[in-house]
Each structure stands twice: as C-alpha cells, then as structure tokens.
Amino acid sequence: MLEEEILQKLQKFGLTKYESLAYLTLLKLGPSKATDVTKESGIPHTRIYDVLSSLARKGFVDIVHGTPRLYAPVNPEIVLEKIREDLISDIERLKKAFQELYREVHGEELPEIWTVHGFENTIDRAQHIIRSAKHDILINTPYEFLEYLRGVLEKRNDVLIIVISNFSEIPLWLRNKNNVILARSGQAPWLLGTWVIGDINYALFFGTLPEDKGKERFYSFWVKSTRLIQNYVHWFYTMYFDNSEIVKPLNYERMEKPLTLSHIRTVITVLKQAGLPRNIEVIGRSLADKKQVTIKGKVIDYEYTPLTANITVKTDNKKIKVGGLGSYLEDIEGESFILLD
C-alpha cells in the first residue's frame, strides 16, 4: 500500500492530515523528539506539540517523559484493534438509533432481508427455521425439497405443522403425526415455489429447485421482520393453502394443550378442523387505546375471507372481535393465541 493511501485510510478513521503524517513518521523513526518528527514530516513546528498531544489522547502515541521528551508510536496492531472495536460499537449504536427513528415514523421494525447463496446453505436455513420455531411451521414446497427437511420435521411433535406439496400420496413419515396438516397443491407452476415460515419470526423463500450444476449459483431469500412475515403468512393461506386440497387433517384432540399459535389465519384453520366452541386466551392490543390486553373466553364464531380474518370471543359479559397484526376492523389486534382445550 502506498504511503499516500495509508494517510487517506488513517484520516477515514478520524485522524487529521497532520496526525496521520505524524503517526506514520513515528512508525518509521521509532521513539523521537518532536523536533525530529517536524524535520522528517514537514509538519510546522508551531503545530507539532498539539498534534502529538492529540495523538496521545487518541491512543496512537505514548509520551516518554524525561529530557528530552520522546514520543513513541503505539503498536499498530493495538491501534487497529481499538479502531475496529470502536467502529463496531459505533455501528451498533447507529443501528439501534436508526431503528428507533424508523419505528417512530413507521411504527414497526426495519425489515431485515438477506440473500442466501448456495443450495446447501438454503437447506441449512430452512432446517434452522424448523428447529427454532416455538408455535407453528408453515411450508409450501415441492416434495423433492421436503425430503431434505424430513429429519428435522420428524422430530417436531410439539408445534403445529402445515405442509403444502405436490403429494402423489401421503408419505408414511408424515401420515401418523398428530400435529400435521397436509395439503396437495394445485398444479399451476407458481404454486410450486418454496416458502418456509417459522412462527412470524423467520421466513425463507425461493422459486424453482436448481439442477445439480446450478446448486452453487442458487440463491434464496431469508427474512426477519414480524410485520413483513405476517404478510407472507397471509399470502401463504390466500395464495397457496386456500387453493389446495387437504389430504391429511389435524388430529387436534391428540395434540398437547394449551396450543399456542402466532397468526389469526392459522388459528381459524385449526378451528375449522377442531370445531367450535373452544376456550381461548388472547394476548394483544386494544385498537381503542393501543394498550396491551389479555382476554379469556370461548371462540363462538369466525370470519375468514381473502380480505378479512377474525374470531368472535365470548367473555363473561360481552362478545369481542379479535383479528391479527394489522387489524383495523376488530376490537383487539391479537399477537398470541392460546387454545386451552
């Protein structure tokens, strides 16, 4: 790296031109008097003491007190490590500040979307979603890709799993799982894209499966954003599930209770198979004052269309309409739905 380029990099890290020049000069000379630094670097004599004192405050120079006073450069590895730590700290603080500013305006978190390169990495991410989900897993994929997820899916008996695929017959390894709903997808090509969603925390999606020669160049999209994923869940149902044929219903009575679900459309999908009424606890926010609320009661009805999805909960003294995130017609915006029986 040329000397001029080094000086430019140091200035990017917060040093002035004279400070960068003085530190570089000390690296060449070793411990030196201020007059020697002036002579070698060309920094004006009237400025050199202020420059060296500033470098000492910033951790680039040690002052050796004595007669004459010497200035020694701090080991570059120590200096660069401190710069790295400070940069990371500043970036994290900025990230937090930006997110808070964004929320003040938009009322939601910054969407986080990454591109995942490589087919094996995509499989790893999909398996991670299945392993880490706490309440429900939604999958739409060709059966060929579903086989890559078999190992982790077989181990999950504690969460609701809904799988849409181009089944020719029900796989034996899924047939006897009480917590699984299976649906056979329509045959339109756009119905064969892959979506893997865990709760409303993580989502992975991609188009067609790659041929062997294209697996290294393959990429998918990884999403972490509650507000964004709730839209994906909406599309999962209205685009895929509602246009598919259920080939294996949920064995609701054999599932462990209470059963916590993360999206209103998932709740209604379960209620359609479990039947009404059902005792439920809902944690969410009142649309009237935006305050956190918890209600308990019986689900006595539901409404489910491509545009709306809500349940009617009867408490001791009234009927309450509960929707999901983004609700605007209901009384409560539900965030967590707990079926009690």
Curated annotation (Swiss-Prot):
InterPro entries: TrmB-like, Tscrpt_reg_TrmB_C, Tscrpt_reg_TrmB_N, WH-like_DNA-bd_sf, WH_DNA-bd_sf. GO terms for molecular function: DNA binding. Induction: Autoregulated. Repressor activity is regulated by binding of different sugars to TrmBL1. Binding of maltose and maltotriose results in derepression of the target genes. However, high sugar concentration results in formation of octamers with high affinity for DNA, which may prevent transcription of target genes. It comes from the Archaea. Pfam families: Regulator_TrmB, TrmB. CDD domains: PLDc_like_TrmB_middle. Belongs to the transcriptional regulator TrmB family. Homotetramer. Forms homooctamers in the presence of maltotriose or maltose. Contains an N-terminal DNA-binding domain and a C-terminal sugar-binding domain. Global transcriptional repressor of the maltodextrin transport gene cluster (mdxE operon) and most likely of all genes encoding glycolytic enzymes. Acts by binding to the conserved TGM (Thermococcales-Glycolytic-Motif) sequences in their promoter region. Can also interact with non-TGM sequences. This is HTH-type sugar sensing transcriptional regulator TrmBL1. It comes from Pyrococcus furiosus (strain ATCC 43587 / DSM 3638 / JCM 8422 / Vc1).
